[in-house]
């Protein structure tokens, strides 16, 4: 493996590759299983980097596809069904997908942030059966450029697989041209034509177009008895989804199928060839069709059309050449970043404004996008901090300020104010609501509190729980850990001893609670952090169960984020539809491999990419790595990520910047 790949993530990559390149989950409909094939935590090594992973196909019928990728990171993905993969290794570099001597079938294609695809009723792809020739799934991923920073990608596709054989089987035909594009032309057409020769009629029901930056329109029609019928047309600069065909179509034996790609080469001073690289172009029209499951497969070895018969295109419909009206909102959504995506380590802070950091236990942003750092100053939580009954032994509050309010620009910080001296015993969680009130949890005093900042003073509004007295009843907490607000209620993770979420009103009055000790859904083994997402749902960090539970405010589990790549999760944060998670400890037995931040997509329960501190390549050249990450937050505009570290003797605040075009 190239030395450039982050050493601290190599173990994670290899674990994911060797243990499983697929995840199988049962959907709410018991007939449907969700089968996911993912990249192995790859970091592209060059421009136009093609890689692939394979996994043995599970028998069934695919009725839907969920992509798990973003155009910031991935140029496109192609999912194939293969009799044999091109390599037996499970992962390989290069453009090969299916092996020689067997079938090669396109099942799905994705680019430019295309959405999910659900097939029509009674239509599905047959996979994993002897007669369909698909024994393996192969996912090919094209990365346009290397990432910035130490980012590792787990993009993939989730298939919804049923065991019920449908009335109609699905397949995909690819129309592809190899004609070069001359320079300085406002409109150049690449044409493709084939004759349909099977006795099994086919019914197109969806289509997808694909070009690179020069493409302006891709269309396809078929000709029956001298009459042209449109299959579809679309601007390839829009999200490259499979668009449904509204009318019922049938292509029969002897019909002509044709496609055309329109290119604009006015800004080119050389001929542009067709090819897989970014400097090349592509002319692709994907036609998804179904046929009667009782009839023979019309394309038993895979469906492709790559011929050009100019004489047969003379009467191609004018509509197939005419541009569609501009759709700026689609072009923006489909935008592929020209700036390499990355999460770059921007700074490591060991002191802020002359204040040496203690263990950084909590982080929060206020309404001015200033960061509140909740740190323990000179007090350290170790084996001598509590007795066997969870009672704090040093009952004096921390004299030094424990809340540091900072502003930041680039890697420079400014200490705006210092708060909380003499008011806290062992800081843990902190949150600032939309009204500017500050909420804290203190594991030393076993309390939850609401505060108001007045100048350089921290004024207490109320305190919930009995000072320095742990308990599990309705009036006590035992080492409460995190707090967040959703609408007019507060949600407290309680915590190290009680394995519950306590719900308060804004005046600190208890309303209810949910959660029990355990590892089932809705149970906890040390709920360590809690945040809310943009929809007002909760993300509870279930630390020792090694997961984040995505829950309603009533405590019902929507999904969980869990992986073999970590055994514990200390903190989580949410921005838009992404969930950021950080373990506090490496996997036992692999302590030298380091720790990474994992990022999943809401609604999937899967990890989509990971990142960590900067490395310089070889192990002996590695820079500072995470010690014991304890808290993580993403700034409100999504541009920065901060991680608080409580490692003994190495308390730090890590600062990362998310790089993409919007920055």
UniProtKB/Swiss-Prot annotation:
Q: Which Pfam families match?
A: Cu2_monoox_C, Cu2_monooxygen, NHL
Among Gene3D superfamilies, the record links this protein to: 2.60.120.230, Copper type II, ascorbate-dependent monooxygenase, N-terminal domain, TolB, C-terminal domain
What Gene Ontology terms describe what this protein does at the molecular function level?
A: copper ion binding; peptidylamidoglycolate lyase activity; peptidylglycine monooxygenase activity
| Keywords, sorted A to Z | Copper, Disulfide bond, Glycoprotein, Lyase, Metal-binding, Monooxygenase, Multifunctional enzyme, Oxidoreductase, Repeat, Secreted, Signal, Zinc
Q: PANTHER family, per this entry?
A: PEPTIDYL-GLYCINE ALPHA-AMIDATING MONOOXYGENASE (PTHR10680:SF14)
Protein EC = 1.14.17.3, 4.3.2.5
Family membership noted in the UniProt record: In the C-terminal section; belongs to the peptidyl-alpha-hydroxyglycine alpha-amidating lyase family.
Q: Which residues are glycosylated?
A: 191, 269, 411
Q: What is this protein called?
A: Probable peptidyl-glycine alpha-amidating monooxygenase pamn-1
Q: Which reaction does it catalyse?
A: a [peptide]-C-terminal glycine + 2 L-ascorbate + O2 = a [peptide]-C-terminal (2S)-2-hydroxyglycine + 2 monodehydro-L-ascorbate radical + H2O; a [peptide]-C-terminal (2S)-2-hydroxyglycine = a [peptide]-C-terminal amide + glyoxylate
Q: What does this protein do?
A: Probable bifunctional enzyme that catalyzes 2 sequential steps in C-terminal alpha-amidation of peptides. The monooxygenase part produces an unstable peptidyl(2-hydroxyglycine) intermediate that is dismutated to glyoxylate and the corresponding desglycine peptide amide by the lyase part. C-terminal amidation of peptides such as neuropeptides is essential for full biological activity.
Disulfide pairings: 82-98, 194-305, 261-283, 478-497
- Which residues lie within the region annotated Peptidyl-alpha-hydroxyglycine alpha-amidating lyase? 301-663
Positions binding a protein in this chain are 376, 496, 543
- Report the cofactors: Zn(2+); Cu(2+)
| PROSITE patterns linked to this entry | CU2_MONOOXYGENASE_2, NHL
Q: Where are the NHL repeats?
A: 411-454, 464-507, 511-554, 626-656
Which N-terminal stretch is annotated as signal sequence? 1-21
Binding of Cu(2+) B occurs at: 210, 212, 282
Cofactor detail note:
Zn(2+) is required for the lyase reaction.
